[in-house]
Every structure is written in structure tokens, then in C-alpha cells.
Amino acid sequence: MFCAFCFLPGELITNRAVSLYTAVKATRIFCRKINLPALLFPTLTMNLKGNILISTTDFGGVYLLQDVVSVSLPVNERMMIKKNHFEPYNLTGNEKRICIVTGIHGDELEGQYVCYELIRKLSENRHLLSGIVDIYPSMNPLGMDSIKREMPIFDLDMNMIFPGSETGAVAEHIAAAIMNDIKGADICIDIHASNIFLREIPQVRISEETAPKLLPYAKMLNVDFIWVHSSVTVMEATLSHSLNKEGTPTLVAEMGVGMRITKSYGDQLLDGIFNLMAEMGIWTGETKKVSHPIVSTDGNVSFIYSDTSGIFMPAIKHWAGISKGDHIGDILDPLSGAVEQEIFAPCSGIVFTLREYPVVYEGSLLARILGGC
């Protein structure tokens, strides 16, 4: 690969005072001065500062792989949280910025496919980018590597320590660095999967307090369902709550099941993200028509719990319409061959949450029905 940086003055490369953007811009100007054909430098990559890499194309886009935070670990190792930063070549200073965040829980993988596809499409169509996109694929890399929901060394739920503290313990320091990096964005989407026990349809969850501001954005995301929670049930130490409190609009998107990737759900949310980016003036490419989600509050949701232990065998499909009295499933006893409990719908509606993991105990959540009783 031809590298245009080879022809740049040495001080441009070594002087850390020179901004990354200036370095990229200087490279482009130099290449144009010598009439270098665009095909000879489709990608220019160089380590200019620490772990930051720059890549550009002649289509007018720039992306940067950046460290958000880096902390020391035992045995001479480091944990690094990275982001992929996309911006248009000709910056005006008025660009809108969107942040896509996922992987706060190490066992939630649905967002990995979304990040991959989003980065792939942006890389191939940077000339259609008119705003700034920051993508954070793994906020809890240790949890993802060890297949654990929490941060394994600290045994902490990472989504329960925000906004963190720059001078606090390691986990708090990490949380504060993430907050500082995202803060100020025009919109942030925090992508989650369910846990390993439940399967969820693509949905956005927001609080009653933030609904007036966030609901218009949520309706653009091509989800099936928007759940407006009571403010009493909102956990204040989450990333989304902390960012919203700081003035950065943040949506929580949830879909699928833990430790799995549902491609159809990922594609659905991707269409919504590009639609939202287009509506905000960040993306100028074509977008697909999005669905109109059902909007509901806590009062419209019914919870179905198990009364006994055993193996749950559903008799309905996920996201299926049911009527009051319909057979939802059975709880079986494999040892005796008996049906311990037959479960019937207490009301009519749509099943938007369904038990995925078969083993249940008394009080286990089996389903949630949109409809209310």
C-alpha cells in the first residue's frame, strides 16, 4: 500500500502539538499537490499518538480508533476501552454527534453485530457522512472476554457505578472516563440484550421524566415497542440516567437474549439508527422506511410469574397476540412426568417478553404481556 505520510516533513509526524486532524488534512493537501491518483491511497493509516490510528479515504471521511480509558491490571497488563470515531473531512464546527454504546454487560452480545455493520457501512460510504459518529463496541471488555455480566476483577455491575469519579477506585475511574467522553453528544444510544433467561423484542426503554424529550428520537429507531417506565423504577446509577441528567439525550435499546446474537433484530435496529442519523443531519445516504412502534407505560404491562419449580415449556410464540385465557405454557417435572403448573393468559395483548431459559423456580418471570389487566 502506498503511504503518503512517507513524503511528509518529519516534524509533522513527530510534533505531538500538531492535532490529528491537521495531520490528516496536511496529508491530503500534499497528495493533491503532487496529483496523486485517489486509487493509490484508498486508506492511509499511521500511529500518530499512543493507540490512536487515523484512516482516511478520498471520499471525504475520516475515522479514528481511540482509547477512551486505559488502566493497569495485574501481571503487567492493561485494560483499554476503545471507540471508533467517524467524522466528515470538511468540518464546519456545527456537526451533530451521535454515540453508539454497547457491551456494558459482558454477557450481552446483541450490540456487537450492530457495531460491526454500522462501522462497515460507514467505512464504505464515508462520503455520505455529514456528522460525527462515535461507536463504543465494548464498554466491559473483561466481562466479555470472561463471559461474565459484571466486571470480573471487581465483581461489579458496570451499569450501577455511573457517573463514577475520576479520583475514585478503578471501576469508578473507568465510569467517569466513559461519561466524559460521551458527554455533550446530541444523542446517545445504549444497546443492551436481555439476560440469558429472557428474550425481548427490539424496544426502547425511557423514563416518564425524560419521555417528552426522548420519545421523538425513540420513534425513529425502528423498534417494535417503546416502554415508558415510571420514574420510581429508574435506577439512577446507570449510564443512560447519568447522561440524561447531564443533558446528553440517551436512549436504552434492548433486544434479543443474553450470550446470543439475533441478526434480524440487529438489522432492524441498524435501519433505525441510520434513519435517526438522517433525521438529525448526520447521514445523507438512503434510509429504509421504519415501523411505527407501540408506546406503552407500566400500567399497560402484565407480568406472569412461575408458582413452582421445574422446566418451562412455552405453548406460544414470542411477539404473538394472545387472548385472555389462552394457554401460555406448562411447567414440567422431569422426574415424575407431571405437569406442575399450567399457565394461562390473565389478559389479552401481545407477548413482548418470553422465558428463554427453561429452568424456573417459584417467582421466576415467564412472560410480559403488553395489554394490561
Locations of the language-model features?
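Short non-domain terminal segments
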Residues: 3-5, 28, 39, 57
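Structured catalytic-domain cores with a bias toward divalent-metal coordination
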Residues: 10, 16-19, 26, 44-373
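Low-complexity proline/serine/threonine-rich segments in eukaryotic and viral proteins
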Residues: 23, 35-40
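Polybasic, lysine-rich low-complexity intrinsically disordered segments
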Residues: 29, 33-34
